[in-house]
């Protein structure tokens, strides 16, 4: 379908030379009682908002004074921290966030409990006791006692001494000799043959001097009655006694040695 321009000079209907008619229709647009495009130019603000109608709205605050320059500066200063500082500050923030992520990846609790160790499995948050050693199994938090050594078995909680050791042993081990090989006291002072002989001689002299004093202190009547030499012993043979008299049962006779004094001293 083609459109052709229609040249008509009808002024009553207000149709100009810019009107068009269809080829299939014999009548024009003006003849069908339709408004021409020029009619819309008479009242453009009725159906469409023109640019001239929007201008008074923008200039409705034109009577107000302009704002002070100091207020604009304060507003701009306040808005500066909100804006990004630049590409140089981005790597620093990324590094801090990466370090926080790495530190948080190894921890699952508040006190630094390793990952995978839950409270339900028997793990505690105390750092002194190794993992897997619970209080119910007899393990304590004392660092000195080895694992598996309970108090009921006789082990103590001493941190410096292993179980079963002597208390004085570490003290003796601390005593160390000097680097020199010589003894602490010279041998000549400890063992002197001359000193020992003189000490023995003095003891013998004291004993010899004390013995006559004891003899002189004894009463004379006791010393005069006893003989100075012991009396001889007389041995009686077994032949003197007959077997029948000594052993009536017919058993073997035994020889007995009886000491007989030849002369008894007079006590008068």
Curated annotation (Swiss-Prot):
Any matching Pfam family: DUF5568
Transmembrane segments: none
Superkingdom assignment: Eukaryota
Protein name (database record): UPF0461 protein C5orf24 homolog
UniProt xrefs under InterPro entries: DUF5568 (IPR040419)
Bias-annotated ranges (Basic residues): 102-113
Location of region: Disordered: 1-20, 81-171
Family: Belongs to the UPF0461 family.
């Amino acid at each position: 379908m083609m459109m052709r321009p229609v040249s008509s000079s009808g002024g009553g209907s207000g149709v100009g030379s810019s009107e068009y008619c269809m080829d299939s229709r014999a009548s024009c647009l003006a003849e069908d009682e339709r408004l021409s495009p020029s009619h819309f130019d008479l009242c453009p603000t009725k159906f469409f908002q023109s640019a001239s109608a929007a201008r008074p709205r923008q200039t409705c605050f034109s009577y107000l004074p302009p704002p002070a320059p100091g207020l604009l500066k304060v507003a701009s200063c306040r808005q500066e921290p909100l804006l990004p500082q630049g590409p140089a500050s981005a790597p620093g923030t990324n590094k801090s966030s990466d370090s926080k992520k790495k530190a948080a990846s190894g921890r699952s609790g508040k006190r630094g409990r390793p990952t995978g160790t839950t409270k339900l499995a028997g793990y505690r948050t105390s750092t002194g006791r190794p993992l897997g050693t619970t209080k119910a199994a007899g393990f304590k938090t004392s660092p000195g006692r080895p694992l598996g050594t309970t108090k009921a078995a006789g082990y103590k909680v001493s941190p410096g001494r292993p179980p079963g050791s002597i208390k004085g042993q570490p003290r003796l081990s601390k005593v160390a000799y000097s680097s020199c090989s010589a003894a602490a006291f010279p041998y000549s002072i400890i063992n002197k043959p001359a000193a020992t002989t003189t000490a023995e001689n003095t003891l013998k002299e004291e004993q010899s001097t004390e013995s006559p004093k004891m003899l002189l202190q004894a009463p004379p009547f006791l010393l005069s009655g006893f003989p100075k030499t012991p009396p001889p012993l007389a041995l009686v043979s077994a032949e003197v006694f007959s077997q029948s008299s000594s052993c009536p049962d017919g058993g073997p006779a035994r020889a007995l040695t009886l000491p007989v004094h030849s002369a008894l001293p007079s006590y008068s």
